[in-house]
């Protein structure tokens, strides 16, 4: 299974650019749990994401949602969804209201997002990947994911909001590996991105 996670930023200048630590933690935890059963590729550049997408189609795309990258995520998500409507796209990040009315409004206007992961997403993303891995390849679709309830996530299915905000916290922070110690941030550090610790 191939997964693309993107924490997109404008990359005209490498001024004040930070490593994609959030998606790094999602990846580090799921890599720890799945080993080589899932391959991850991380992106900061929208151009690199879309160029890679054109060469090799993933099984899942995940986008971050911050005030500074809303437009980039929308551009990339809409581009991918237009070309492959059945490809599941998930999103997470703090740039969303946390009440169900606000979540529903967001998902209805952001049609390229199939599932939104609320709060810290390490466990939710792991559960999504586990669900998709347990499906036959032809049932790893956007519609199948929208119909699946994952704790801490919301979707629009059959024209209604489904899901919950039941976020699971780790009992021990050491349960989630560091994306820096696992080497996931090395390519970004080599490109001159600043670490967020």
Locate predicted features:
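Nucleotide-activated donor-dependent transferases that construct or modify glycoconjugates
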Residues: 1-14
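Beta-sheet entry/capping signal
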Residues: 2-3, 88, 114-115, 193-196
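Glycine- and acidic-residue-enriched helix-capping/strand-helix junction motifs
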Residues: 12-23
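A short, N-terminal amphipathic alpha-helix
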Residues: 26-32
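Glycine-rich beta-alpha loop elements in corrinoid/cobalamin-binding modules
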Residues: 29, 37-170
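Radical SAM [4Fe-4S] cluster-binding motif and immediate context
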Residues: 173-197
């Amino acid at each position: 299974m191939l997964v693309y996670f993107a924490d997109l930023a404008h990359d005209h200048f490498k001024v004040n650019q930070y490593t994609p630590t959030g998606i790094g933690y999602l990846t580090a935890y799921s890599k720890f749990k799945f080993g080589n059963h899932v391959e991850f590729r991380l992106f900061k550049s929208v151009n690199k994401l879309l160029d890679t997408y054109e060469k090799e189609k993933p099984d899942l795309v995940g986008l971050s949602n911050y005030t500074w990258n809303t437009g980039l995520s929308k551009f990339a998500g809409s581009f991918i969804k237009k070309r492959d409507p059945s490809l599941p796209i998930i999103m997470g990040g703090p740039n969303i209201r946390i009440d169900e009315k606000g979540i529903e409004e967001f998902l209805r206007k952001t049609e390229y997002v199939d599932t939104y992961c609320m709060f810290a997403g390490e466990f939710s993303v792991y559960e999504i990947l586990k669900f998709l891995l347990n499906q036959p390849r032809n049932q790893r679709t956007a519609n199948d994911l929208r119909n699946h309830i994952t704790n801490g996530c919301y979707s629009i299915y059959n024209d209604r909001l489904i899901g919950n905000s039941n976020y699971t916290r780790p009992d021990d922070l050491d349960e989630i590996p560091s994306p820096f110690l696992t080497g996931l941030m090395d390519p970004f550090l080599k490109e001159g991105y600043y670490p967020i610790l």
